Amino acid sequence: MASTVLYNSLTTSTTVFLRSHLPISSSSPNDELHHQSSVISNCNYYLKKSSFGGQRKKLKENNNYVKAAAVAESLKTYPNEVAGDVPEKKLRILVAGGGIGGLVFALAAKKRGFDVKVFEKDLSAIRGEGKYRGPIQVQSNALAALEAIDMDVAEKVLAAGCVTGDRINGLVDGVSGNWYVKFDTFTPAVERGLPVTRVISRMTLQQILAEAVGEEVITNESNVVDFKDDGNKVSVTLDNGKTFEGDLLVGADGIWSKVRTNLFGHSDAVYSGYTCYTGIADYVPADIDSVGYRVFLGNKQYFVSSDVGGGKMQWYAFYKEAPGGVDQPNGMKQRLFDIFEGWCDNVIDVIIATDEEAILRRDIYDRTPKLTWGQGRVTLLGDSVHAMQPNLGQGGCMAIEDSYELALTLDKAWQKSVESGRPIDVASSLKSYEGARRLRVGVIHGLARLAAVMATTYKSYLGIGLGPLSFLTKLRIPHPGRVGGRFFITPAMPLMLRWILGGNSEKLEGRIPYCSLSEKASNNLQRWFEDDDALERALTGEWTLLPQGSVAGSLKPICLSRKEDEPCIIGGVFHKDSSGMSVALSSPQISEKHAQITCKNGAYFVTDLGSEHGTWITDNEGRNYRLPPNFPTRFHPSDVIEFGTDKKAVYRVKVMATPPKASQNSPSAAVLQTA
């Protein structure tokens, strides 16, 4: 069961994660200047024609549309609700589970005047779920639903999160690191005036929600083990024997829901086929300003890494095997190196940067959504009825959407009962909520499973997984499935993201679409989507040649200059007359003036200067070739450059960004690390 913290111990963090990747204290969300400078209903974003057709909206800056104006407009429509004068509705709602879904629903119901009581099992959200699952991705659709529920709470969540939706995200080949398909999660949000996707510490999110719900609503150390529905009231029984009575019960007690079991009997969760290792590392990649998250694809395994702010990266490593596996003590990191041997530097480097103690493992389960979510005065929401695989990052988002829809449906039913003078029909209201959510949840649940199937069947080259024919892999022939998959995914992905992120926005009553200047993406975003070369040139780290091989210990790293008039000369002796840097390598196969490395427009080139034994490059797809003399050849991150053929001067190209020292000991960094 997901759970929350004891309310009395809550102190909501004021630390936010901005694109600087340093924790910065935020001003109060109620600060007038904060609103006027950061939230505007029309922004100066100009979005080119999208890949899925149709003209993207041109949104111009207009200072007349500050958030205060939006609030004033909503005051006209919903004066009582915005002013906080919500008439109390004589309907008592019991909620089993104080995880994200349970707390969001409790907040939504409380805001609409209902009497809510949340029963929470223990502190597993901090010690268990929060520890195992780390920061959570809250996507645009869920953030918009939060805004429709409580704008002040939503602003705290927005301020505490690290924006990832304003950068490149997508799928890459796990071995080469080359882009397979890029995701645009920015445009679908801005087109509909939705907040841009963020990641936030799970603990921080639950603290914000619990503080808003209130101490008087949450009862900790209270595990709902049974209930009775007599048609007029529902009574719940806790594991300590206490009973409570209400007008309806909402089961938000997670994938192992006791409410679900009591409703429909025992049913096994569905094993996804994957075990998952996860961790958080003090690590900042060189493309942190241009890439939010990546999914690295492989055959029967895949790896996900995401910026979570504060100089940290969160990662998940999925591996197809039977459930219940156990690693050797302190052996998880080594097993990851074994599983992902030969994969690209982006995967290996973040594993290297992760402490063994920070790595956790769990098997991944989901539940097939039921056509019937409840009976009588009892219903379910979130993982208790449609637990999803984490591949789309929509599990928690769907719970938030569920919460909004259920609170809205009950509110409308109450208003109808007041107008008609008849008692509220709770059972019919719950059925209406279930019907409104069933299709959307079912489709997204299916897409999450489909994403896992894609990862299972992905093969970069012909010969992978073919046993005796595996030698074909060395020929580097693109696998037909890889080619065909890209042909399908490229046009389908924008449509899918547009529906996932924006498909629920029209149901959010009273929410006024707006854009935030603080979420403005780079002017180069569109170019990065279209041009991998431009994305590489945007790297902000230091280009370095790192020695590798058996004699690496006798060589020193070579740090390359970005200045075009400062070349690096590689040779057997120092060249004092060089306008840049001179590196002397002691090897019989290194010519006196062997090669030259130059930078032009952010790209690096190596030129063999007519050396006897040549200069060689092995690229990220394993192709090895000798450079033609006196002809500049571009090289890329992860390429291997060899001067001569005796393996005594071999270097790997790395682009490294050092995480800020301030982030390592900051309170926010500590929160993320323990999450």
UniProtKB/Swiss-Prot annotation:
The protein's name: Zeaxanthin epoxidase, chloroplastic
PROSITE patterns reported for this sequence: FHA_DOMAIN
Domain named FHA: residues: 558-622
Note on cofactor: FAD enhances the epoxidase activity while other flavins such as FMN or riboflavin are without effects.
Entry cofactors: FAD
SUPFAM superfamilies: FAD/NAD(P)-binding domain (SSF51905), SMAD/FHA domain (SSF49879)
GO molecular function annotation: FAD binding; zeaxanthin epoxidase activity
Catalytic reactions on record: all-trans-zeaxanthin + 4 reduced [2Fe-2S]-[ferredoxin] + 2 O2 + 4 H(+) = all-trans-violaxanthin + 4 oxidized [2Fe-2S]-[ferredoxin] + 2 H2O
Residues reported in the UniProt entry to bind FAD: 92-120, 370-383
Keyword annotations from UniProtKB, A to Z: Abscisic acid biosynthesis, Chloroplast, FAD, Flavoprotein, Membrane, Oxidoreductase, Plastid, Thylakoid, Transit peptide
Gene Ontology CC annotations of this record: chloroplast thylakoid membrane
Species the sequence originates in: Spinacia oleracea (Spinach)
Biological process annotations from GO: abscisic acid biosynthetic process
